[in-house]
Design a protein with these regions (language model features):
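C-terminal segment of N-terminal export signals and the immediately downstream linker at the start
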Residues: 68-126, 130-133
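Histidine-anchored nucleotide/phosphate-binding helix
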Residues: 152-168
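N-terminal export signals
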Residues: 33-46, 52-78
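Acidic helix-start/capping segments at beta-turn-to-alpha-helix junctions
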Residues: 170-192
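Acidic/histidine-rich, surface-exposed loop or edge segments in extracytoplasmic proteins
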Residues: 130-147
Length: 313
């Protein structure tokens, strides 16, 4: 048990060192102008490793405050929800750790002005991040077809990761959420939930995006005590941030964004009087940190299965 604690501490210290390097590297990178589909030049805070960023935020440092300010209130909800210093990827998961670092350092497209109904160029989605997932060499690999937000979709993913890691000892196992349908609403930040009144869209079953909340009872739980019935690997930990900290990846769906934006327009939920292309861009720009946007989930699923991911529903 003591050895596990030392390993978690060692990995977190290394993560903080890597953050300083990657943060400097990212700040020095020049932005490219993107002429595709009316998109402006883009950058994204997600290129900074999320776990290291949260460690800075927790210290109250000037750099951390600047990052939080740049993220905006909505994305700050996601950041503030994650217990600083928690590294929940299993010990020995070298391939998963490398993938997580590569994904964190990969730029996302989040400053669109307009997006079309059908995406026709890789610059319009997170193609580099998706390629990393398609070429991941760890195993086993599983993709969950998640559509219904009322189902225990996060619980199923958590159970799968837990049994793979602790029972079958597959440290490099990865679970991906192929997110569409109403589940896709969980991938929007607080800005979208407030601006477009998503609680009403979901029949007031949720007052806000509670999928980003980490319950208080697990915040101080030990990552070393994996059998704690109320701990970080228990049903109490069914939330997006903790699953992401365990290496899970959530795919976004442009088709779901386009169709949902059309539904908002039809119902008059368009406070800024945007066009369909502009409203879809607004939703795209406010996906939570860490999401990998695809041109369409049902089209991406065959690519994932061809790449060795087992389909689960």
């Amino acid at each position: 048990m003591a050895g596990n604690r030392r390993e978690f501490s060692r990995r977190h210290s290394l993560a903080q060192v890597n953050f300083r390097f990657l943060f400097h590297k990212e700040c020095c990178m020049s932005e490219k102008s993107n002429q595709i589909a009316g998109a402006s030049s883009f950058t994204d805070e997600n290129t900074i490793p999320r776990r290291q960023m949260l460690a800075w935020l927790a210290t109250g440092s000037v750099a951390g405050a600047a990052l939080l300010s740049g993220m905006g209130r909505a994305n700050a909800q996601t950041a503030a929800a994650v217990p600083a210093g928690k590294d929940l990827e299993p010990t020995g998961a070298t391939k998963l750790a490398a993938l997580t670092a590569a994904l964190a350092a990969t730029r996302r497209h989040r400053k669109f002005k307009k997006v079309p109904m059908i995406l026709t160029h890789p610059d319009q989605w997170d193609s580099a991040a998706l390629d990393l997932l398609l070429h991941y060499r760890g195993s086993p690999k599983q993709v969950w077809d998640n559509t219904d937000i009322s189902r225990p979709w996060l619980n199923l993913m958590r159970n799968s990761i837990t049994a793979q890691v602790w029972s079958f000892r597959n440290a490099d196992f990865i679970a991906i959420s192929a997110t569409h349908g109403t589940c896709h609403l969980a991938l929007y930040d607080a800005y979208v939930w407030e601006k477009y009144n998503l609680p009403a869209v979901l029949g007031h079953k949720f007052k806000r995006n509670t999928f980003l909340d980490i319950p208080a009872k697990v915040r101080n739980a030990s990552a070393a005590d994996y059998n704690d019935p109320l701990g970080l690997f228990s049903p109490s930990a069914n939330c997006l941030p903790l699953l992401m900290d365990r290496g899970a990846v959530f795919l976004g769906c442009h088709n779901a964004i386009w169709e949902f934006s059309g539904g908002l327009l039809a119902k008059g939920h368009n406070p800024d009087h945007l066009t369909h292309e502009e409203l879809a861009a607004d939703l795209t720009n406010h996906l939570i940190p860490g999401v990998v946007l695809t041109p369409g989930i049902v089209a991406t699923l065959p690519l994932l299965t061809m790449a060795g991911y087992s389909y689960a529903k």
